[in-house]
Amino acid sequence: MNSRNKLAEMPIRPLLYTMAVPLMLSLLVQSLYNIVDSIFVARLSETALTAASLVYSIQFLMIAVGVGTAVGLNALLSRKIGEHKPEEACRAATTGLFLMIFTSLIFSMIGIFLSDTIATKLAADSELQELCKQYLSINLVYCWGIFLQTYAQRLLQAVGDTVLSMLSLIIGAVLNIILDPIMIFGLLGCPAMGVRGAAIATVIGQIAGAIAALLFNRFRNPIIHVRLKNYHFMWQDVADIYRVGLPTIIMQAIGSIMTFVVNRILLDVSATAVAFFGIYYKLQNFLMMPINGLGQAAIPIVGYNYGDKNYQRVQQTWKILLPTGAIIALCGTVIFWCFPGQLLQLFSASSEMLLLGIPALRIISISFVMSAITILCGYFSSGLGNGIINMVGAAIRQLILLVPCLWIFIKISGISHGWYAFWIAEIIACIYSYYMSHKLLKTICK
């Protein structure tokens, strides 16, 4: 069954699951190499782990721009294919490539000229500043690897080929995991480079994944091809990409702002609290990768059938998507509740971190189901061409309510009660996202 027939005719449940499983696996592997980075860096020192946690907010901002642009492009391509306009899809894909290259150049310039300045803003301690600068400058200067990798993967996803998208991610992730201990600790004749080695291993993995994804598109993508000959740039393509992409960028950037602000709040508590939050955020991201894989699989299904005016299949996707995500999130809650100490020990947690982190993981994990519903509602509405619901839901759960509630609770009752801020933020965001997405669905499917 070809890509068009699969998106139009295959029963929704097996279609969603067969597309989602490769994406889940690839995203889990991608998240795993972030965790492996932290595990190896933690063996250097808690200071090195704190530096990696502080830099993560800036990395996340960079990734936000790439992922947001790619999500907008993915939604546009799926609709064009559903409308049976392959030439317009190819033109949009070419425009998307230029946008990715331009954006990566901007971040590379930031890495070359502003890494020192950013490091001084992230930390006051001179040792922390130096470690932050080492890790950050390499990731920014060579960011074109992650931008091209994200772009090429979304072209594959737009035509329903999540298996090759998965393989490209796995290639980069496995290479990163192999290179991490070699470059950090100086194995096999390689000089020990510490935090700098972790950053180099990361960008090499990203570049390898980008090359693989681009080659897969060149030889295995049956519909979408980048065509420079007779290419005509159209601002309408840019507008269509960022109609969904800009809210997604803002949504992702909110996560970056949140981690930066929360780290500043937690620095007033202790450096251990900052290191713990960095660990939690990567563990939580690992859990949410299956949720994100499910949501990313839904975008081309919803976008194609919306473009094809097959609204019944859009409704079926909605009815299957949310319960599946809730079950996955519930499994994560059980794991975090039952094994918090074991999870923290993966990162060589000190006794102080265990004392702080075990109750924190248990408290926060209660909100995972609500978080999953918010995320999936955002992906679903993005597939319908509405990125605002995604953006506002993310703003509520990660910034508007979480940050002030966390600050207030810590000031009033201490750090042990601060984690309850996650409950308030996730409940309100879940209610908003479900209501608005369901309302959008009813409007479209009248």
Where in this protein do the model-derived segments appear?
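N-terminal transmembrane alpha-helices
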Residues: 7-39, 43-44, 60-72, 76, ...
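Interfacial/gating helices of multi-pass transporter permease domains
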Residues: 18, 41-60, 127-131, 195-196, ...
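Hydrophobic transmembrane alpha-helices of multi-pass small-molecule transporters
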Residues: 61-64, 176-181, 210-214, 286-289, ...
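Short runs within selected transmembrane alpha-helices of multi-pass transporters and secretion channels
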Residues: 70, 139-157, 165-173, 198-213, ...
